[in-house]
Regions:
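Catalytic nucleophile-His microenvironment captured as a short glycine-rich beta-strand/loop
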Residues: 252-255, 261-278
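A structural boundary signal for the start of the first folded domain, especially the loop/turn
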Residues: 2-250, 254-260, 282-361
């Protein structure tokens, strides 16, 4: 039923011809309808997509040498247009590449630090720059495989989320930001530029007699070294144990069912002791969820860093659900359905108005 909404701009274009608009401009009507379809699809995609977090580790570094670019420009002087040439100097650029293929800029100090740590040799590379008149070139160095001497990074990726605006059990109730704050729920931690994402989140009322920074770093490494292969991103959330395990499901609702690659381990902590554990994910198979709960039943007072090491060795039972196999995408919520039809109607009205302006009689 909702798919019909995407045909409304085409119907508006056909209506323009039926109403007697100049048919010689049929190509203009078609272009307007095509542009309208693109805008409608983009709006629908953004409304039904989510941002997930992906992690990786640096496997290659590049240093691009300074270079000078020749630019041809035009300007108007005394009513006449004349062309002139200017030169732009570009400084050194330092680039990292992750095992996932993602690339980005890296500060010079971090580049130099990693180069000193890596026992491999630099090699010259040819760097292509448009309109380069001097300088250029560069060098690269590759990681040798030692986990202890590389860095991890986390970045965002947008994907179609069939749970976001559907009548899915996993989606849960809608919780607003102020309500979440009152309940003591966590916001998604954003990756920090040139640093990493905090993946162990601790409620201010929790007293945990352990090294959170150490656990956080160990979990960042799990996400970076196992994330691409296992399609997983793990968070650990520490709540006061007296909140009860129901707070974990409110957290799931606030995070809109979580993301497809996430395993969220929620723990009720009282000093050194873990009183309860709940896991949140899209998995159909509960094997790993049950293993995690069993771990904390038997190791309720163990250091969380040891748990992360244990989890890394037990990821064989993790399998991310494929979005294409989910059957919720056609079961849109009432709000999303109204949003789609109102948007399609307004865009179609705009198509008809443009057609009238071009070929109306």
């Amino acid at each position: 039923m909702n798919k019909i909404a995407f045909f409304l701009p085409i119907v508006a274009c056909a209506a323009a011809l039926i109403l007697g608009f100049d048919y010689h401009y049929w190509w203009a009507y078609a272009l307007i309808a095509a542009a309208a379809e693109g805008i409608l699809y983009l709006m629908f995609y953004l409304n039904n997509s989510s941002i997930e977090y992906l992690s990786g580790h640096i496997v290659r570094l590049e240093h691009h040498y300074p270079w000078t670019e020749r630019c041809e420009k035009s300007r108007t002087v005394g009513g006449k247009t004349e062309r002139y040439v200017s030169y732009v100097d570009h400084e050194d650029e330092y680039i990292y590449e992750l095992n996932t293929g993602h690339t980005g800029s890296i500060p010079e100090k971090e580049y130099e630090r990693l180069v000193r740590l890596w026992p491999t040799y630099k090699s010259e590379i040819h760097v292509q720059h448009r309109h380069c008149v001097s300088g250029g070139g560069g060098e690269e160095i590759k990681w040798n495989g030692d986990e202890s001497i590389t860095e991890t990074k986390t970045y965002t990726h947008r994907y179609r989320n069939p749970l976001k605006n559907s009548y899915s059990v996993n989606r849960g109730q809608k919780i607003k930001k102020d309500e979440a704050k009152a309940l003591g729920l966590f916001d998604y931690p954003e990756p920090v530029a040139d640093a990493e994402q905090q993946v162990v989140l601790v409620d201010p009322d929790v007293y945990y007699n352990g090294n959170i920074d150490e656990t956080n770093r160990e979990l960042q490494r799990l996400n970076a070294f196992c994330g691409a292969e296992k399609q997983i991103h793990v968070f650990i959330l520490l709540f006061p144990s007296n909140e009860g395990s129901q707070i974990a499901f409110k957290q799931r609702d606030y995070w809109k069912g979580c993301n497809k690659n996430e395993l969220v381990v929620c723990l009720g902590v009282n000093d050194k002791q873990v009183d309860w554990c709940e896991t949140l994910s899209w998995m159909d198979n509960d094997a790993l969820n049950n293993e995690v709960k069993d771990y904390f039943r038997q190791n309720y007072n163990k250091n969380l860093t040891e748990f992360v090491k244990w989890l890394r060795a037990h990821l064989d039972n993790w399998k991310r659900v494929e979005v294409k196999t989910m059957k919720t995408s056609s079961q849109m919520s009432l709000g999303s359905t109204l949003y789609l039809w109102i948007s399609a109607s307004l865009i179609s009205a705009f198509v008809l108005l443009c057609a009238y302006w071009i070929g109306g009689k």
